[in-house]
Amino acid sequence: MHDERIIPDKTPLGIYSIHLKRYEFAKTYMKGKLILDVACGVGYGSRYLSDAGNRVIGVDIDSESIKYAQKRYSSSGQPLFVQSDAAILGINSDTFDVICSFETIEHMRDVDGFLKEIKRVLKPSGLFIVSTPMVSESNINPENPFHNQEWNPTDFQHLLTQYFGDVKVFSQSRRQTKVSKWVKRVDLLDLRRRFIPKVIVRKIAQVTGVRSMDRLELDDVIISRGIIKEASEIVIVATDENNK
């Protein structure tokens, strides 16, 4: 498992909450559906969707992650975890009601091939819910060594409109108060996190009415319609259903 894998028992609460929030958001679009979770990692998100009354197949290219998911999160065959390459799924066409793929597309070398494969296995009326880190400038040489490409919101939306007729853009960000926004604005060099001990950072967060990063819970993370500059991730819900 590489360094970006989220393992609930080992990953800091704040990072886990940020990732799980996308599954909570996706859950609102599904009930009693057949779901594909692409690049499911160790399977915690697939299990979350399965517990909400959906049939879920989680696929990941990493055999270690799939073994962990099968042992930790699968019960009576649900979710079903399968090792598979996201670009070559080996699944029948027009199979799934909803496909989720969170923080995956930026890792893909062949993005167009990946999206064509998603489109192939998704039902004509299906939903594709996808997220990627938000950056101000699109680039093909990211600082993150695990990423092959990154997009700003406009370019990411344009990419998805090449494959889907109806593309809705959302932003994921941390909940903020007026005071916390002011503190962030005046702390241009991010000195709080770079030089101040964690216990003091937590106190500052408490005073400003928010939780510090290491204590974030689901309610501290917001996914809202449109693009906001404070966002850390872009989330898109795409379909062809509304264009028939």
Predicted regions and their residues:
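Short, electropositive alpha-helical surface patch
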Residues: 182-194
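Residues lining the SAM
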Residues: 102-105, 131
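Short aromatic-enriched loop/helix-cap "lid" or pocket-rim segments at secondary-structure transitions
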Residues: 140-144, 178-185
